[in-house]
Each structure stands twice: as C-alpha cells, then as structure tokens.
C-alpha cells in the first residue's frame, strides 16, 4: 500500500501494490497552502513515510496534545469552550520526510514540524484547506486508513 495526497483536489488516495486506487478520502490541508519551512504553517510536499502510528485502541474523538491522549473526548461543548484550539483527534499518522534538504533535516524537516494525518471534529469542512500544516481527515475515514497502513508506508504529497 501507498498513500498519495493531492492538494488541489483535497483528496487522499490509498493505492494498492499495482498503483490502483483502493480507497479515496476527502481531506483538509493547510490554509496557508504548501511549503516546507518550519513555522510556515504550510503542508509539506514530496516523498514521506509514516514514521509512527499513534492512538491504537483509543476511543473515537480522543483528544491528543503532543501525541498523547489528554483524557478528553471531543464534543461540541468542549469545542465551544476552546474555540481557538487546533483539535487533533482519534488517531495520528506522524509523517517523516524522505528528501534531505527538501522535507528532511534542518528547517524543512517534516517530522520535526510535527506534521500528521489526523482526525478532526465533524464540524471541520473537508475538501477545503484549513489546517495549520497537517492533513485533516474525518474520524471514521482515519480509523479505516489507520488499520490499512503500517509504519513505513510511503506517502507522496503533491500540488
């Protein structure tokens, strides 16, 4: 399996070993567009791998901060209480760049930028950029994807 993320269409394709689309999901990438620099709040481009899978066994809508469950379960009431919070929910696929000087090492290191594929509240619109760099997915879609991929799975992000 391999993941291909197309920024213009805001779609994530899970490809089988022949390169055929096995699953297609709507996503939300960065509101600032694409870019490699740390602090840009952009979605990085290029070849990546899934560095780590985080959150297996946690309930749907589990809230994560710094890749750790907080003990909170997201609800619309919690969202209203913290309207400016960037919600990372349910599962995390932590990405690592594979291209030194482009998306790996130094000020362009995807992993050190903490770029994830992660779940988000149901109120977040998919198909429209809006994150601060990560790839947001519907929780149910992410649960499915999480079970279909392994750490080390290739992820290509293109504009």
Where would I find each of the regions flagged by the language model?
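Well-ordered beta-strand positions in beta-sheet-rich domains
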Residues: 24-26, 47, 114, 154
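Short, surface-exposed secondary-structure junctions/capping segments
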Residues: 35-53
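Exported/periplasmic cell-wall-interacting domains
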Residues: 60-159
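Soluble periplasmic/extracytoplasmic beta-strand elements of cell-envelope proteins
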Residues: 4, 13, 49, 92-94, ...
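Short, solvent-exposed loop/turn elements at domain surfaces
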Residues: 35-36, 58-61
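Extracytoplasmic
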Residues: 7-9, 22, 45, 88-90, ...
